[in-house]
Amino acid sequence: MPAFLARPSATPPERLAAGPLVLRRVAADDAAVIAAAVGASLEHLRPWMAWATPEAADIRTQLLRVAEADELWETGTGFIYVMIARDSAPARPPGTAGSRGDPDGEFVGTIGMHRRAADDAVEIGYWIASAKTRRGYATAAARALTPVALELSGAGRVEIHCDEANTASAAIPRRLGYRLDRIEAHEREAPGERGRRMIWVWDRGESPAAGWSAGPAGRAARSGAG
């Protein structure tokens, strides 16, 4: 087992440091800020995310999705985190913290790990609010979750999927050193897609790329450019 992997685990930590971000398990308290970010980002998200509809900007929809995320977490099939930008946090007096014990900071987006039935792959997926793009946040979060995903029991590889036309999303696994395993046809689900899905893979046994930190949480991980 590579040195940067720990012992296999059924579930990941509920809170992780990821360079400029804190990744925290999504909770009902996050529904309002997620709904607001989706609403402000619909034009940015709609070309690539089939779920990016006006209904997704409703807090009631997000409360339902948080409940679904809780069920996935408890069954060990999906693990959804909110990304909070620590580098945007104002200074606070020693010994104080924001709500839920997190440092103050701005919501950036969400990222998740998904187990696939009868498969040893763990898929990482993410979205970033339109006001927070091009700051390295998705790269930092995916960098932190890659070794965490490989620590899940039975995980043999990590995958990142994106349509071939979504060059911004594809730049993230490429930057991190993932291998483009294949491009396969798929049904177009969002208007910007070409119907050609890129499957980027990180196999168990590969060592982290230069600049990656040791340890499952990626505590010292360096922020990327995208």
Predicted regions and their residues:
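A short helix-loop-beta-strand connector motif used in the catalytic cores of GNAT acetyltransferases and
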Residues: 54-55, 67-82
